[in-house]
């Protein structure tokens, strides 16, 4: 019996790799939808499964976030604070610019009793988010950047939150509520920006088609 040559196995390997990637992507989307609906236990199970299969999985292009950020955030939301801290610290070790992960690390620390360090992390995350939106809306103003926070509502909210955080006697429950709102709002903003960009592209294509036919 002749041995199979390496190149004869390549299509099968590529097929299996593609199927695995599709499965991981599908699991992630199921987890993300569960998270956005507030079903954090289900979301955590999905995210943990994705992390086991592909620990380097990243979601998003304009504002990429690693799978460890999602695992840590849902660990926080389900009250698993020690695990959330470890996971979020790992996420930041892999990418120091993941401000949503930093925000939830701060929330985790505040809830665990380390308010001073927690507030520091929350403040740093808020500044990072604000600066990123400012940068992307200017640097990519003729492309996808124009669809991020077009009315500056999110940036205005962050500025208000930063003023509250910088106060020495910031109310802890209010701080937690505002930071949790920001984490969810930042996640939703990416979806809204993508929808608006897709809608605009469809309108442009329709307009181009009508013009070409005249």
Functional labels for PLM-detected ranges:
Residues 17-37:
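Bacterial Sec signal peptide processing site at the extreme N-terminus
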């Amino acid at each position: 019996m002749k041995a199979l040559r390496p190149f004869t196995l390549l299509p099968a390997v590529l097929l299996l790799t593609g199927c695995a990637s599709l499965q991981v992507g599908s699991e992630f989307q199921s987890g993300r939808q569960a998270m956005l609906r507030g079903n954090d236990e289900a979301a955590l199970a999905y995210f943990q499964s994705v992390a086991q299969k592909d620990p380097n999985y990243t979601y998003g292009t304009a504002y990429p976030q690693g799978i460890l950020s999602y695992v840590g955030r849902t660990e926080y939301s389900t009250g698993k604070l020690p695990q959330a801290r470890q996971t979020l610290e790992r996420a930041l070790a892999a990418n120091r610019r993941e401000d949503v992960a930093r925000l939830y690390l701060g929330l985790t620390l505040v809830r665990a009793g380390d308010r001073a360090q927690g507030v520091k992390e929350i403040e740093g995350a808020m500044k990072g988010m604000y600066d990123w939106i400012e940068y992307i809306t200017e640097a990519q103003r003729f492309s996808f950047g124009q669809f991020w926070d077009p009315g500056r509502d999110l940036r205005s909210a962050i500025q208000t939150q930063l003023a509250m955080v910088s106060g020495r006697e910031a109310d802890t429950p209010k701080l937690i509520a505002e930071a949790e709102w920001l984490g969810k709002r930042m996640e939703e903003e990416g979806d809204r920006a993508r929808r608006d960009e897709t809608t605009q592209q469809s309108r442009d294509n329709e307009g181009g088609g009508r013009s070409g036919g005249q």
